Amino acid sequence: MPINRPNLNLHIPPLNIVAAYDGAEIPSTNKHLKNNFNSLHNQMRKMPLSHFKEALDVPDYSGMRQSGFFAMSQGFQLNNHGYDVFIHARRESPQSLGKFAGDKFHISVLRDMVPQAFQALSGLLFSEDSPVDKWKVTDMEKVVQQARVSLGAQFTLYIKPDQENSQYSASFLHKTRQFIECLESRLSENGVISGQCPESDVHPENWKYLSYRNELRSGRDGGEMQRQALREEPFYRLMTE
C-alpha cells in the first residue's frame, strides 16, 4: 500500500523525550509501580493472552525511507527528513494519555537484516492493538557502518503510561509485556539474526532482540552499576518476572 502523503505544510514536532540526567527525581509513575508492584504483578498473571490484529497494507522499509517530511499510514504520522538518521512514527490519536516516564525498548538486529526485520514487525508496529504510540527505526543509508544505531538498537519503542495521571494500569502493562514477547517471537520465526545490544540497556536471557532502558535514570554510556539499577526498575521487573 502506498503511503498517503497529503499536500500539507505541517510542522511535526520531535518526540517529546526527556534527556537522561544525573540525580533525576523519581517520578510518581515509578513510585506507583514500586508501591503497587505485587498487586500489579498478581493482576497481570491472571489476565488472558492479548491478541494483536496485524495491520495490512503497511509500507515496507523502502517505503518508510521515502516518507519525507510528512506521510500517513494506518493512523501513524511518519517523517524522515533532514539530517535525522531515524524514521519516526507517531500515532495521530495517542492511546496512552500519561506523560512519558522514560521507559523504552530497543530492538537490535544484524545490520544487513534491518529491512527484513522491519518486514517481519511492521504489521504489529502499525497495529491498532499495539500499546506503542511512538517508535522509530534507523535509516541505514544515513549512518556509518560502525555507528551505535547501525550495529544494534535500530528500533526504539517509547512506552507511555496509559492513564491520564501518568500511572500504568495492570491491563496496559500486561498488554505491553505480551506485545514485546510477540515481537521477539516474530523476529525469531523469520530467521532474523540479533544485533549488538547497547551497553546502556538490560535484558533477560530469553530476550534475543529486545532490551530495556529508562532514560530518565540512566545514560548511554552504561556500566555495571547502571545496569544493576535498571534491573531493579519496577517497570522492567513487571516485563520480565
Curated annotation (Swiss-Prot):
Gene Ontology MF: a single term: lyase activity
InterPro entries: OspF/SpvC (IPR003519), OspF/SpvC_sf (IPR038498)
Domain of life: Bacteria
GO CC annotations, alphabetized: extracellular region
E.C. no: 4.2.3.-
Enzyme class: lyase
Residues at the catalytic site: 106, 136
Compartments (UniProt record): Secreted
The UniProt record lists the keyword Iron-sulfur: no
Protein keywords: Lyase, Plasmid, Secreted, Virulence
One Pfam family recorded for the sequence: VRP3
Broad class of the protein's primary localization: secreted
Disulfide bonds: none
Family the entry assigns: Belongs to the phosphothreonine lyase family.
Role, per record: Secreted effector that irreversibly inactivates host MAP kinases by catalyzing the dephosphorylation of the phosphothreonine residue in the pT-X-pY motif present in MAPKs, via a beta-elimination reaction leading to a dehydrobutyrine residue.
Cited NCBIfam families: PRK15245.1
Protein name: MAPK phosphothreonine lyase
Organism listed in the record: Salmonella choleraesuis (strain SC-B67)
